[in-house]
Design a protein with these regions (language model features):
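Short, acidic Ser/Thr/Gly-rich low-complexity loop/linker segments typical of extracellular
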Residues: 19-24, 29-49, 126, 195-207
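A short, solvent-exposed loop/turn motif at the edges and junctions
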Residues: 44-76, 161, 215-236
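Autoprocessing Asn-cyclization modules and mimics
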Residues: 94-95, 100, 112-185
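Structural motif
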Residues: 2-23, 92-116, 120, 210-212
């Protein structure tokens, strides 16, 4: 009997609307080879029986930028959130705020770097307990508005040198469950900002779109908080160093 193991479960959403993208609309490659993950309703893709080690999943879809994620297969089941960013031909229905961000390292384009962008003002979600210690996976959170307005997925805890990316797995009755334990301690009132992962191209640039003028926090896993960018409605061009 053939045993089937879910090595990775990917939740794919439209990074602009937050709505799920169904697997039938996506073209997928795994480690450079075309593949057909098992597609489940609600924007889920399931990768089965992966060999142990590092893998790279790349997704393409009409109207979106190519997106990719690297992950480690270790015998368990990895949970991955993938946001597809609007690209050429995306059907915007209102005025938008665009950002073209150039990232430099030692005065040269920083190609192939992974950054997280986290806009403020979409909704208010913050830590509601006196202190959350490193290693905790369950947090008491305050959401200004209905809890269902806070989507599951990646968030930036904006906390100076202790800033970090966390994954919100569930949120009910003021209790949020994370996908992995906290790496740092955080005190009451620290904001959780919805975050999306971006990659710079060969020219060190990335493109992002937001619904309205906002302030965007820029974070890199290896460097922490890099910048806080105030964006105006329309076109914005910024350059930051790593």
């Amino acid at each position: 009997m053939i045993s089937m193991h879910a090595s990775a479960v990917c939740r794919v959403v439209d990074g602009y609307t937050g709505k799920p993208l169904e697997g039938s609309a996506l073209s997928c490659t795994l480690d450079g080879v075309f593949c057909r993950p098992v597609a489940k309703q609600g924007g889920y893709l399931v990768l089965l029986n992966l060999s142990p080690g590092r893998h790279r999943l790349a997704l393409c879809c009409r109207g979106y930028q190519e997106e990719w994620v690297e992950f480690q297969a270790d015998g368990g089941t990895r949970e991955l959130d993938i946001t597809m960013k609007p690209g050429a031909g995306y059907p915007f229905r209102q005025t938008i705020t665009r950002l073209e961000l150039t990232v430099e390292a030692a005065g040269h384009p920083a190609a192939g770097r992974q950054l997280w962008l986290a806009p403020s003002g979409l909704f208010e979600l913050k830590l509601a307990q006196t202190k959350a210690e490193a290693g905790e996976e369950q947090l008491r959170l305050y959401c200004k508005g209905p809890e269902e307005t806070a989507p599951m997925g990646a968030y930036l805890i904006a906390d100076g040198t202790n800033s970090e990316i966390v994954g919100l797995r569930s949120f009910e009755r003021e209790m949020g469950m994370l996908t992995t334990p906290l790496r740092h301690a955080h005190s009451r009132g620290k904001l959780l900002l919805p975050a999306q992962r971006y990659h710079t191209g060969p020219d060190g640039k990335l493109a992002a779109v937001f619904r309205a003028a906002c302030t965007v926090e820029v974070y890199a896993e290896e460097a922490g908080l890099l910048a806080s960018l105030k964006l105006e409605e329309g076109e914005n061009r910024q350059t930051i160093p790593l």
